[in-house]
Amino acid sequence: MDNIVKVNNISFEYITDEAKLKAIDNLSLDVKKGEFVAIIGHNGSGKSTLSKNLNAILMPTEGNILIDDMDTKEEERLWDIRQTAGMVFQNPDNQIVATIVEEDVAFGPENLGIEPKEIRRIVEESLKSVGMYDLRDRQPHLLSGGQKQRVAIAGIIAMRPKCIIFDEATAMLDPSGRKEVMKTIKRLNKEENITVIHITHFMEEAVEADRVVVMEKGKKILEGTPREVFSKIKMLKEIGLDVPCMTELSSLLIEEGINISSDILTVDEMVMELCQL
């Protein structure tokens, strides 16, 4: 399977009058087409800085990033790169630009010079894909947080990306809104084969990924399947990260002498395990 993202030994420094802060330190990462990768790490680990480098908002100080074989340092490819790898930010209000939902989703295709008839078809498809078509005439400020974020996702989908980067896109949402957005993310990945890079601090969201990457002090310190990564409970806690609730619970039950698996990730898995006792 081909890689859509290749991060080659990148470093990134924030430079101020007082000092240089290395936010990413010699990091490499490949993401395959159609893969769902979650990137986790506590505040200051470099994960959001990485996401902005992937979308060419920031440029690596060292190394390079290829998005579908396009180098993010090539200014003339910037528009193509951002169309290929769209980005959804933490606050949907910062990404919504129009006063009507369908007009907001149409904004990107209009700037591509697409014919109006084709734009209408794209907008309809994009809104239906995130379950927001029935609210196409609504004003965005009247929507819930989860609905706004789905409109922002529809706006990215309308650009026909091969990859979407979610930079803590659920962080400002309540549990219901997070559930809405995660359902949308999973459907886009599994049904439309859109590559997903999901930066998050919610471990239950990372469980949904094909692969989890753990960052600490700008470095990639661990990666693997969710089951492999979250089995390292002690290591994760030492760097200030939690593990999924059911993984934590299974660890506590094992300490109490209950004979269950140590790599449980979800409620359903816990129920099945306990029913076998």
Curated annotation (Swiss-Prot):
Enzyme class: translocase
Membrane topology: Peripheral membrane protein
Entries under PROSITE patterns matching the protein: ABC_TRANSPORTER_1, ABC_TRANSPORTER_2, CBIO
Physiological role: ATP-binding (A) component of a common energy-coupling factor (ECF) ABC-transporter complex. Unlike classic ABC transporters this ECF transporter provides the energy necessary to transport a number of different substrates.
Gene encoding the protein: ecfA1
Family: Belongs to the ABC transporter superfamily. Energy-coupling factor EcfA family.
Assembly and binders: Forms a stable energy-coupling factor (ECF) transporter complex composed of 2 membrane-embedded substrate-binding proteins (S component), 2 ATP-binding proteins (A component) and 2 transmembrane proteins (T component).
Superkingdom field: Bacteria
EC assignment: 7.-.-.-
Protein name: Energy-coupling factor transporter ATP-binding protein EcfA1
